[in-house]
Amino acid sequence: MWSSGIWAPIALFVLTTASIRQQNNVLQPTRSLAQLALQKVLSDASPIFGDYVHSNASNTNTAQWMKRYLDITKLVHMNIPGTHDTSTWNYSQATQDSLNHVTNLDRVSVLPPEYYRCQDRPIIDMLDAGIRVFDLRFAFDATNTTLVFYHSQALQSETATVEDVLFGFYQWLDCHPSEAVLLSFQYEDSTKAYASNNADVQLAMFNILTSDAARKYFVQTKGELGTLGEARGKITLLRRFDLDRLPQSYSDALPGLHFPPALWRDNGLDITLTYNTEKNLTAYIEDYYGLDSPIGSGAALNIQWKYNATTAHLTKAATQYLDSLFWTFASSEYDTDSPPETPEIMALGNGTEYTPLGGVNQRLLLFLQSMKGKRVGIVMFDFYETPSNLVQTLLDI
């Protein structure tokens, strides 16, 4: 016979173990298969979207800045910050080196990463910082089966597909239902030898944008921007690609605004593009990205030229066609200059006495501070986080 004195410690151990297990179950609840699947998708998307974590930043004013606007506010009346070539934030030398084996399959050569890199913060940080418009460039991967992100010949990630990254946006919008996101999708040319926006590419993009998930999260209105209330918790598609290799019914089935590439004048200082001919709805766009000053002009002059083009368009947005869409790109480069001006130099200056005023961003900060009470529309930045109050200044106009 065992004595009660022997059983007591055993009973205590069993009860303590059960209690610990119960506590662990409370602290770490079992995840559903759907949650595990989403976690896997977000992990694959992380080289472009960033690591999805619920941080304190998600509760900041910039993460929920649209809360302060009424539902009846028209999107064309709002000042909305965006990022140009959003997916390039992680394109470091290490990233380029890690992707060389894929780039070699594409049979292209790439320049140093600073020629392609236009951002240095992930999409999740951009969202929390108040960015709401994203410029995304896609093409087929080396296998010609999956849509991924490029900047010219520079593949941005081997694992982060277009569809994966969209799930990052969907998840973020679920956590921020007051916000509206606008995604500009553009087919990227020159990604690899013999690549083209063919029927297979177009069908792949169509399938992504008409999936069950996309139908839930994309605003289904076609051909016009509505109110903030209609767009909250959803994505508005800004379509900078054609489906001309597919029957017309495919284009008819896609929501959002269509900006035909043939009408988007390359390197345009002042583009006028009618995106809805029936209602005569027009977008006014500045996309003067490639400077054409004489070789050797230097960073200071080229920054000044780009600043002049940007502020001229923002002034037009504040004073003309107040019920129309204005879309201004503050981004630029002059990589054929000697020495070259990379996107970072154009945005922030080159850190020498030759650019004492900084780059376009620093100069725009002062300009935006002078535009209090004005509508300037969508403004697309490179390296948006410098100066640190640039985005907040746009939001506070």
Give, region by region, the residue ranges found by the protein language model.
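Conserved, mostly hydrophobic/aromatic
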Residues: M126, R137, L183, L237, ...
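Structural alpha-beta junctions
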Residues: L203-K222, N267, A317-D323, I397
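Fungal secretory targeting signals
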Residues: M1-Q22
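C-terminal active-site rim and adjoining tail of enzyme catalytic domains
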Residues: L238-R240, D244-I397
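Catalytic cores of phosphodiester-bond-cleaving enzymes
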Residues: T161-R215
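Loop/turn elements at helix/coil->beta-strand transitions in domains of secreted/extracellular proteins
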Residues: A129-R132, P177-V181, A214, R232-K234, ...
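An acidic- and aromatic-residue-enriched active-site/binding cleft used to recognize and process polar
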Residues: F138-D141, F185-E188, R240-D242, Y384
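Long, acidic (Asp/Glu-rich), low-complexity accessory segments flanking structured domains
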Residues: T17-A129, A142-C175, A180, R245, ...
